[in-house]
Amino acid sequence: MARTRTGLAAALVVAGMLAPLSAFAQQGVDQQINDAVKPYADAVSGFIFSSFSVAGVQVPFVLVWLLAAATIFTLYFRFINFRAFRHGFQLVRGDYSDPLAAGEVTHFQALATALSGTVGLGNIAGVAVAVSLGGPGATFWMILAGLLGMSSKFVECTLGVKYRNEYTDGTVSGGPMYYLSKGLAERSDKLKTLGKVLAVLFAMFCVGGSFGGGNMFQANQSFKQLVSVTGGDLSWLADKGWLFGLVVSALVALVILGGIQSIARVTSKIVPLMAVVYVTAGLVIIFLNISEVPAAFAAIFAGAFSAQGIAGGVIGVLIQGFKRAAFSNEAGIGSAAIAHSAVRTNRPVTEGFVALYEPFIDTVVVCTITALVIIITGTWDPSVDPSEGVALTSAAFESTISWFPWVLTVAVLLFAFSTMISWSYYGLKAWTYLFGDSLITDITYKVLFLAFIILGASMQLGAVIDFSDAMIFAMAFPNVLGIYFLLPVVRQELDEYWADYKEGRLKKFGKAANRD
């Protein structure tokens, strides 16, 4: 009850501070801010998303950077994404989970927290845009990229646990900031300075990304979807973004003030719920159009290798699919390693196995269902504006059952909320890495995070959000570069653990022990 009052009080204080801004937004202040930030945002975004041309298609360098790493990791660890898939499920189920191990959350809770940060609006809006611009064949390449991305998650989450800081009060702090600085210093004195620089860069990018893509964008897009289903411009909510932002910030405050254990408890409930809501709705549409399913899969496979009418041909299709997978599951970005590092385990590689499920669920399952719905209903549109992805998916849902956009709205709200609470944790850990772990730095970050929710819902700050989105993908450069130096460390952890697993030397707990 005390935490509830504290959360509401924090949100009300933030609302009071921002009320004048939301009013000024009606007078164009948000446009002035947007115009002032735009030149810098465009420069940063242009640099981070710099591209080169292949068959007339612009290929972002960051996309190649992420996919090359995923492919290298898959080969280096001998297709661990497939070999350890079954064992990962055993760990999620708790078969080998020592309740006395260091850490704050279970394997399942860590996975749910990380999933809540990746399974979001990109799975709904981004897939619709990818299929529209790349055709049904983009789905094939999206799935392939998701499978490769599993190896990236394995590596970064193993390192996140291995190099985390464990404190006397039982809390932990981990993620790329720690394995870049501590891991590279451990490898060689010559790499110590590089590790510190990469860690600071990652933390700075992570803080920026948490305020935009992990916060303002989520609040902005979920508010737009709610307005859309309640009457559009005529909706009584149309000019009340500040009110929506206030309510959401209060709900977020109730969760994040309790730390990772509170976040994990909530996400472990929300993630299964939102997955069931969205996946069930998608499967209902697929079932009602079951006769179209064979043709849809035929179009996916045919379109993957023979793309007529698609800009850039097969290369264009491949890029759209790979782009959506990479931008959706964030494999190689490093964000998920922060959540996974809080797990209770004494064997770092176990969380790497659990993390394999993140890209699989996010991309291979959820994104594929969205793609099938778009293809089967025939609502994909090559002329679609990238900002209209949610509307396109909503139209696909509505084409089968008129009230299904409401189901989609519930999913959007759940996706956005869960993404915000997860990214608040990512940003906080990066913030405290930069400014120290104290009560003041903790409260300062959380108040700022809650403030940005209200701003995101009530103001149109496109350039600010674009800049922050660029920060998320900028995280990939220091993260992946550092990981290359640490691959032998992960290999040693894997070989030692896998030998114990294969020879039956691992202790089982709970129901798993009783089954033996």
Where in the sequence are the language-model features?
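Extracellular/periplasmic helix-exit of transmembrane alpha-helices
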Residues: 26-27, 156-164, 168, 281-299, ...
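Helix-loop-helix module between adjacent transmembrane segments
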Residues: 73-74, 116, 145-172, 181-218, ...
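Transmembrane helix-loop junctions in multi-pass membrane proteins
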Residues: 25, 76-82, 123-126, 210-223, ...
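Flexible loop linkers connecting adjacent transmembrane helices
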Residues: 79-107, 129-131, 135-139, 151-192, ...
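Alpha-helical membrane segments and immediately flanking helix-loop junctions
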Residues: 100-133, 159-163, 168-184, 201-207, ...
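Extracellular loop-to-transmembrane helix junctions
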Residues: 55-84, 132-171, 362-369, 404, ...
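N-terminal alpha-helical transmembrane segments of multi-pass membrane transport
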Residues: 2-121, 131-138, 149, 484-516
